[in-house]
Structure formats: C-alpha cells, structure tokens
Amino acid sequence: PVLIVYLLSITAWQNIWMSISILVLIFLPLISFFLIKKLDFDTREQVDPTDSEIKEIKQWKRIEVIKDYRFYIVCLNMLAMPWIATGVFVYQSFITEAKEWGSFVIAQSFMVYSILSVLTLLGSGFLIDKFTSRKLLIFMNIPLLISTLVLFYFNSPITSFIFLGLIGISNGLANVLGSSSWAEIYGVKFIGSIKALTTALMVFSTAFGTALFGLLIDKGFSIEQIAMVSFVYILISLILLFFVRNKLNPQYI
C-alpha cells in the first residue's frame, strides 16, 4: 500500500495497473514452473490401513453437512472476517475521512496488517498441530472483535495501526482454520465438496459486506455505528460457538 501511494504521486494509476499486469504475466509462470518442478506428493506420515480408529471416523457428505446445525454456527464465525474486512478495505476512504487519519496513515497501517497476518499464519500452524483447529476456533475472531471496539472508541491516527493489526491477526488465523477445521470436524474424504460450499459462502459474504457497509453509509450511519453493528455480529457468533465448542469433535461410526 505504501509503495502504491508513492507511485500514485509520480505516475498515473493506469500506468501502475499496466506495470502490475506485465509483471504478473512475466514472472508468475516462471516462478510457478520452478516451484512445482520437483514437487513431491508423497506423504511423510506412516499410516496403518488396518487402524480401526481411522476406519471408524465418520466421513461426512456435503448433504449431511448442510443438515448439521454445527456447520452454520461455525460458518457464522468463519464468515465474519471476509465480510467485515472487505467492507473495511472497500470503504477505507470513508473511514479515513471520518477519523481524519490522512491518506498515508491507512496505507502505512496495511503494512502492519500484512506483517501480523504472515506471522499469525506461521504461528497458527504450530498451534493447530498442538491444540487442534477445533480448540482454536473460539479465539479466531477475538482480535477482530477488539478491532471494532478500537474503531468505535478511538480517533487517534495511531489506532489505525492497532485496528488493522488486529484484523491481520484474525485474518491469519482464519486462513488456516478455514481449511483445517472442516477436515477435523467432517473428515477428509468429501472435503472438496465441503470446501467448495464454504468457499462459495465466503465469496458471497465479501459481496454482502460491501453491500451492507454501503447501505449503512447511505442510511447515514457513522463509522462508529457500523463498527458496533460488526461488534454485535461477532459477539453473537462467538457466544453460539462457545456453547457448541465441546461438540465439534469428529464423530465415530
């Protein structure tokens, strides 16, 4: 973001997009070719095919998942990050003007968002291996919840870094838990169709977030009021998840 803001000060935005397109066309195929050239698909795990526990784990089909109430509670939490973060990104100029942060502050804050997202991604893998995704789910949106309070109560430019940093932490957790949680709860045999469903819901939620933010802004809502709407949604989804947190274990046949 900081680089783009700097480039906008010295050249037209059309030139920036054209340069990005050329770089992607040239370097992405080359990088992809060299990275997958010696890709090994063999697993390092030693699995005993006669292990009774592995054979007894229920592998849920998508039609069964749709009928499971736990799916919708987990989805409420999984979809919080996409619709709220997309709303923030699309309407960042509205937030900047409302908080009087200045155009460069929000761009600099995205660096904090990116750094914390990457660090959380790296750390969350270790935590999942140690504690499982099911136990970490309840913590995923807590940083996002706090970020809405930061946006509601504070106006100082420094809070922009805290606000987007907290969103970055939730984003890092959501990116990893969004795949591993479904596999832990519903098994891996039909994970493709389950992930297709959840990905479709995620895409819908990003469009929903953009539309909802725009509608609320048109209705005269302040950014603080929008933050409180987001806070209430996250809080309700967390409370529901809290009550089913001990029922997310895989089922055995």
Residue ranges and their predicted role:
Residues P1-D40:
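Helix-loop-helix hairpin linking two adjacent transmembrane segments in secondary transporters
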Residues Y6-I22, L215-Y233:
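A membrane-interface helix-boundary motif in multi-pass transporters
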Residues I36-W60, Y252-I253:
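Flexible cytoplasmic inter-helical loops of multi-pass small-molecule transporters
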Residues I63-S124:
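Extracytoplasmic gate region of multi-pass secondary transporters
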Residues T120-T132, I217-D218:
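Helix-to-loop junctions at the C-terminal end of transmembrane segments
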Residues K135-L149:
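Structural signature of the two symmetry-related core transmembrane helices
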Residues L173-Y186:
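Intracellular juxtamembrane helix-capping segments at the cytosolic ends
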Residues I185-G220:
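A late C-terminal transmembrane helix in Major Facilitator Superfamily
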